[in-house]
């Protein structure tokens, strides 16, 4: 009796992702030589960016933030922005490359939200908001 082969549980296939990026990079070079704008990213590459960002947001250090969707959007935006910087000759691991981009995008969003919260708190302190709503017991 033969055993069924266990299917990998990874949500992004690194080899297929690398092949899609190589094809996209070739299209970018051809468009650049022809003087045309950068071609649109394929649905598969976009889906990989979304999966990486979504699954990274489930890590314990990111899961409880109220602005998690904004973090995911920032991560995807940065991946699209820096997709041409990925060099398949240097690295054969696009999953790690884009995970790092998304990770640091998450950290930047957290810092940005903390600054906004500090600004809100300073405005409330200066406006005397607490004094107006303080009750005498």
Predicted regions mapped to residue ranges:
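Solvent-exposed, amphipathic alpha-helical segments
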Residues: 20-27, 78-82, 109
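Alpha-helical interaction segments
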Residues: 1, 7, 14, 76, ...
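Extreme N-terminal regulatory/targeting segments of RNA polymerase sigma factors
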Residues: 1-70, 129-137
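Charged, low-cysteine interdomain linkers and short loop/connector segments
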Residues: 110, 118-137
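Sequence-pattern detector for short linear motifs
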Residues: 6-8, 28-30, 112, 118, ...
């Amino acid at each position: 009796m033969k055993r069924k082969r266990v299917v990998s549980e990874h949500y992004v296939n690194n080899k297929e992702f690398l092949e899609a990026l190589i094809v996209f990079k070739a299209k970018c070079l051809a468009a650049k030589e022809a003087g045309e704008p950068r071609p649109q990213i394929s649905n598969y590459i976009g889906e990989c960016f979304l999966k990486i960002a979504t699954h990274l947001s489930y890590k314990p250090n990111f899961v409880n933030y109220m602005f998690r969707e904004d973090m995911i959007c920032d991560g995807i935006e940065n991946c699209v922005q820096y997709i041409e910087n990925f060099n398949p000759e240097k690295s054969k691991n696009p999953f790690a490359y884009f995970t790092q981009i998304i990770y640091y995008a998450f950290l930047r969003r957290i810092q940005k939200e903390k600054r906004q919260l500090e600004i809100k708190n300073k405005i409330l302190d200066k406006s005397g908001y607490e004094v107006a709503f303080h009750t005498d017991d």
